[in-house]
Structure formats: C-alpha cells, structure tokens
Amino acid sequence: MIGRERMTVASQRLIAERTYELTLSGRLVQEMRQPGQFVHVKVAASADPLLRRPLSLCHIDHKQGQCTIIYRQEGKGTALLAQKQPGDTVDVLGPLGNGFPLEAAPAGSRALLVGGGIGVPPLYELAKQLTKRGVKVVSVLGFQTKAAVFYEEEFAAFGETHVATDDGSHGTAGRVTDVIEARSLEFDVLYACGPKPMLRALAERFPNRPVYLSLEERMGCGVGACFACVCHVPGSETAYKKVCSDGPVFRAGEVVL
C-alpha cells in the first residue's frame, strides 16, 4: 500500500566516492515488502528542486522500522539530501513500482544477481530474501573504479560474490559480462539492475533464459500519471509501458532497452 510520511533520518554515511548510505525510520517501512521497489523522496521543503527523487530500497528492516537507501550525489537534489543529519526528516512517498519476482527462483535453484554502479543497491534486499527462501545466490557487481566500490562484503555474506571494475583497479578488469563468461557462472534465473547498455548486453547474451531487469529512468510523479518514464514495447510504435508503475522490473524482451 502506497503511503506518504515524513520519515526520520536514523543515520547517513559516505560509503564510496560520492555514494551515500541513508537509513530512515518510520511507519511506512511496514508497507515495504518487495525487493526492487523504490521510494520517491522530496529533498527540500521548498519548490526548488521541484521533483522528487526516485531511490531504490536497499534494505528493509521491519523489526527496527527502518529502511536503507543508497544513492550517488550527482546534482542539486542529491547534494541537499547528502546534508541531512540524524534527527532530520524527509518527505517520502512509497513504496512504489513492481519489484523482482521472488517466485521465479524456487528453493534449491541458483540465482545470479548482476548490478552495475548505483544499480547495485536494490539487489541487496533481493539477495537477503532469496537466501531466506533457500535459493543459492551468486552476485556480480560492476563499478567504474575501486573508489566507487561498495557493499562487496555485504553481498559476500549471502554467497559467492565477484566484482568488476572498468579500469581494473579492483577485482576483474572489464565488465560484469566478462566476469560471467570468465567464471562460467551458471544460473536458473538472472536478476539485474544497472545502466541500459549493461541490461541490453545481458538480455542479448541470454535470450532464452529467465532474465529480469530493473530499469533506471528519470521520473516525474512516480505513480504512472505524468508519462515521463515510458519505454516502448517490442513490435509496436504506439504501445508502451511506464517504468514507475508497470516496472521498474521487467522480464527481458518485455520492453525495448
């Protein structure tokens, strides 16, 4: 159920280059269930910046009533968010969207989780929930450079984890697809989140496998009303789906990347 609340900042810390881990407390956490969903955050009380920021849920803790989001400071909005201190409040709308289908990976199966950059965070809650369901999780995380790497140890707590960096400064030199090929990683289902070129490469490499992709798009409303985040459906010039409400997770081939 979608709700809105002024959630309280429990903690915030810099975990990698321009990358922050923000933990929020509030009643709205009890509505957060599905990995891959996101929240829409208003970073300031004023009208500037006007639009909310869509931020993926990284970790959901119902017992503590807290959720964690990880974001990269890129513009004015996220710069303001990075200034928030414990005790401050943030206007949050959510949870929004359709997340990763857990039922696609039954107990005893092998799930490959592939994340690129700021697309890594939503895979953490997914890894946690899949592991609880008896699924073997293997993670491949891609970053530009060593300074951008985060949550390597956290993912390793759930299973085999590999890191790739574009410049070779940490882990395997190259891209996530290079790791999958070099390690001959097998899977029953693949879940991924990251930049479109990465998602496209995965969809093309595994055309006949169950592959679920979480898209990252700029959004206006977050609830499907403004049509700012539409993507086309294959084989049609007029049909489309909304990333915010139909997604952000789609099965490979469901939308044009």
Curated annotation (Swiss-Prot):
Responsible for channeling the electrons from the oxidation of dihydroorotate from the FMN redox center in the PyrD type B subunit to the ultimate electron acceptor NAD(+). Heterotetramer of 2 PyrK and 2 PyrD type B subunits. One of its GO terms (molecular function) is flavin adenine dinucleotide binding. The keyword Transferase does not apply. Binds 1 [2Fe-2S] cluster per subunit. Binds 1 FAD per subunit. SUPFAM superfamilies: Ferredoxin reductase-like, C-terminal NADP-linked domain (SSF52343), Riboflavin synthase domain-like (SSF63380). The keyword Ribonucleoprotein does not apply. Keywords: 2Fe-2S, Electron transport, FAD, Flavoprotein, Iron, Iron-sulfur, Metal-binding, Pyrimidine biosynthesis, Transport. Belongs to the PyrK family. Residues 2-102 form the FAD-binding FR-type domain. One of its GO terms (biological process) is 'de novo' UMP biosynthetic process. InterPro entries: Cbr1-like_FAD-bd_dom, Cyt_c3_hydrogenase_gsu, Dihydroorotate_DH_ele_sf, Dihydroorotate_DH_Fe-S-bd, Dihydroorotate_DHASE_ETsu, FAD-bd_FR_type, FNR_nucleotide-bd, OxRdtase_FAD/NAD-bd. Pathway: Pyrimidine metabolism; UMP biosynthesis via de novo pathway; orotate from (S)-dihydroorotate (NAD(+) route): step 1/1. [2Fe-2S] cluster binds at C221, C226, C229, C244. PANTHER family: DIHYDROOROTATE DEHYDROGENASE B (NAD(+)), ELECTRON TRANSFER SUBUNIT, DIHYDROOROTATE DEHYDROGENASE B (NAD(+)), ELECTRON TRANSFER SUBUNIT-RELATED. FAD binds at R53, P54, L55, S56, I70, Y71, R72, G77, T78. Its cofactor is [2Fe-2S] cluster; FAD. Coiled coil: none annotated. This is Dihydroorotate dehydrogenase B (NAD(+)), electron transfer subunit.
